[in-house]
Structures are given as structure tokens and as C-alpha cells.
């Protein structure tokens, strides 16, 4: 039973399986979780800009993901992080970053209408 649980992909959508197989794997849509965790940590905890996060990711994941794959998911990460902020905003908006968490209750205070353009411009220069 534990092996079945460990072999089950993470998918918060909880869609029922089709023909005994999971219909949607979130990681297929958003990218490898290990990359997203890496991007999130260095963006929020260290305050690094996209170009620095990209350089470190290329070194860290050398032999695991190539530059193009890392760049693809970095672009996706920034786009989704900003576009999905409204889902995390259940309290009044206000900027504040504490530790690596996106909860608006104590760690991340980010306006739900923040613009991703500044970050995406930096990421686009990496191509």
C-alpha cells in the first residue's frame, strides 16, 4: 500500500482515474517540482533575480535538465507565480516577504495585481 502511495503522482486536481490511470499529472503541466521549489526558494528566500536563478539552476541541475528545459520552466514559473497570486490573496494586499512560503497569512504579502513583465523581460534575455 505504501509503495502504491509513493508511486502516485501529485495532482491536487483530484480528477478521477480513467481506465485505472490518472488522467492528469500536475507536474506534466507546470514542470518538475524540484525546479519549481528551487526557483521559489531562490526568488523568495534569497531575493535573486531571474538571471542569477537561471545560472545557479543550470549548474545545480547539470546532467539532469539542459538549459532549454530549465529556461522553459523558469518562464512558466514566473508567469504562473504572478498570474496565480490572486488565489493566495485572501487578506488585504501588502508587500512583505519573510521566509520561503507563499501564504499571505504570514510570509508573502504580494499584490494580486502585480505585473510579471519586469521579471519576464529578464527571463526573455536568457534565451
Go through the PLM ranges and name each one:
Residues 1-127:
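ATP/NTP-dependent adenylation/nucleotidyl-transfer catalytic domains that generate, transfer
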